[in-house]
Amino acid sequence: MHAGGKYCGPRHCSFYIIAFLICQLFFLVIFIRNDDASSANELLSFMNESEESDHLDWRVFISHTPETSEDFYQYNIHLSNALGLIRKLPVTRHHSCTTRNSILPAPLEANVSVVISFHNEARSMLLRTIVSLLSRSPEDYLHELILVDDGSQRDVTLLDDLKRWMGGVFGSRYRLGLTFLRNQERMGLIWSRNRGASLASGRYVLFLDSHCEVNEGWLEPLLERLALNTNLAVSPLLDPIDPTTLSYRKGNELLKGGFDWSLHFHWLKRQLTNQESLEMPYQSPAFAGGVLMMSREWFLKLGSFNPYLKIWGGESIELAIKLWLCGGQIEIVPCSRIGHIFRRRHAFDFPPQSDRQLSPAQETYLHNSKIIAESWLDEYKNMFYALRPAARRIPLDHTYDELQRMRKERRCHPFEWYLRHVSPELRMHFDELSATGTLRNEDRCVHARQKDSQPILASCYLSDITQWSMLRQSGQLSTHRELCLAVGFGMRIALEPCGRNETVRRSQRWVRLGTHLLHAESHLCLDNPLKDRLEMSTCRSHAVSQSFQFALEMEGQT
């Protein structure tokens, strides 16, 4: 019926009906397109709309990055600035991950607080970390983002500028809680992460580095695993981002995290069983890098990251040991992928320490590692001291009463349990050796220089003094670079690649006679006739120049 109160004719009615249907179809298409985009993608659209306002333009924000060399950041800062806020990442997870539906608890029972600590990070890299997180995370589960500026000196306005920029972009459009914290002085990653976690209010806490890019569907597989075990800690499989080209590459599902007796992190190879497939979560002795997620309550019950550790280094290893020994587990979840820049060296300085013979970075590492050894390794701490004798003179200014009380209350296992059930590779390495550590002759130690095939005697307190391992079965004397001490033509002592066949091994076989090192093939002994020189000579039972002692002997000497 039209305005005059009369019914329309068939032709007019058809016209109105068709027009009405076209309008409905138009609005339906708009609705579907909007519904397909996540709230974070709507946020990105809002960013583009607001580029007319300089204070909301991300390019203006990035332009305030202090001028400095690429060496400072240890990645390609110019390319990072050119990439913009977000980029399309390759699909690196197994195809079955994209077709299965994760079984998740209700959002209120599984909301996540994300803690990102940074120190002198480039603006574009930090912003890309944040935006990739927001654009690829389900809004209902992402509860809050806590950003901790650990006393950045090069860019002191970064946090305030970021706060204004994000406030202008978000306004009231997003329910995500935002917390901005700044340490007035450098406190370190460990202290900063603990500070963020103490203020978090989500069920779970995710620790994320500030030079990452999260990939599609990264959160749901982690939440699904955590819902099955409240004492579990999970890590995504990290895809490496090349620091020079910023190319995003697929990570390796056949690697797990571990460490050696020097308490350095290492990737360990793993073998798939007949029941396992590449996309299945798998247990790991340690975290793969510093990206991990667990129940906030469980994290706090375990004492958080050890607050006595300084600045950076060892915190993930300490937490991993603590988790496994005190009733927890660690899993790597290959269906969850996060890109991570592994820098070739530290992009920050360590504060000066007390020992002038060590660099600040070396002393900080030894300080933190010594705390881990004294806290958790029990009688196996002697392995650490054998390989890192300089740690003995590092002072520790606290006791372990609180830690021992926690170990007793939680009925934590001894470290022997970890070797048997979690990291048999570490136990195997221990069982393979008859002696290890520095090899000392009086006040000097046998040292293999990087670019020289002939070993010498040098100060035992060199920061890179060679650590030797005497293999129990083969009698080979090996460095960590898998170079073996050998005797060649003319009785010349040299370093050679450790041999696998018996012919090569003969020239590399040594026998312990008391404190002497007898070369099995020549029946001569290692000798030190001059201050820094090594040679082979006839064995003399009481010759001090032929007395060589390992830092740690695992079996009685012949």
From Swiss-Prot:
**Segment Catalytic subdomain B: which positions?**
281-343
Ranges for region Catalytic subdomain A: 109-225
Its GO CC terms are:
Golgi apparatus; Golgi membrane
Question: Where on the tree of life does the source sit, at the highest rank?
Answer: Eukaryota
A biological-process GO annotation: protein O-linked glycosylation
Pathway membership: Protein modification; protein glycosylation
Which Pfam family, any one of them, does this sequence belong to? Ricin_B_lectin
Known EC number: 2.4.1.41
Task: Please list the cofactors this protein needs.
Answer: Mn(2+)
UniProt tissue specificity? During embryonic stages 16-17, very weak expression in the midgut.
Query: What are the annotated glycosylation sites?
Result: 48, 111, 501
Cellular location(s) = Golgi apparatus membrane
The Ricin B-type lectin domain is annotated at 422-556
Which residues are recorded as binding substrate? 150, 186, 210, 312, 343, 346
Q: What sections of the protein cross the membrane?
A: 13-32
- Residues binding Mn(2+), per UniProt: 209, 211, 340
Which pairs of positions does the record mark as disulfide bonds? 97-335, 326-412, 445-460, 484-498, 525-539
Positions on the Lumenal side per record topology: 33-558
Show the catalytic activity. Answer: L-seryl-[protein] + UDP-N-acetyl-alpha-D-galactosamine = a 3-O-[N-acetyl-alpha-D-galactosaminyl]-L-seryl-[protein] + UDP + H(+); L-threonyl-[protein] + UDP-N-acetyl-alpha-D-galactosamine = a 3-O-[N-acetyl-alpha-D-galactosaminyl]-L-threonyl-[protein] + UDP + H(+)
Q: Residues of the signal sequence?
A: none
The topology of this chain with respect to the membrane is: Single-pass type II membrane protein
What does the UniProt function comment say about this protein? May catalyze the initial reaction in O-linked oligosaccharide biosynthesis, the transfer of an N-acetyl-D-galactosamine residue to a serine or threonine residue on the protein receptor.
Question: What's noted about domains in the record?
Answer: There are two conserved domains in the glycosyltransferase region: the N-terminal domain (domain A, also called GT1 motif), which is probably involved in manganese coordination and substrate binding and the C-terminal domain (domain B, also called Gal/GalNAc-T motif), which is probably involved in catalytic reaction and UDP-Gal binding. The ricin B-type lectin domain binds to GalNAc and contributes to the glycopeptide specificity.
What family is this?
Belongs to the glycosyltransferase 2 family. GalNAc-T subfamily.
This protein is called: Putative polypeptide N-acetylgalactosaminyltransferase 13
What is the organism field in this record?
Answer: Drosophila melanogaster
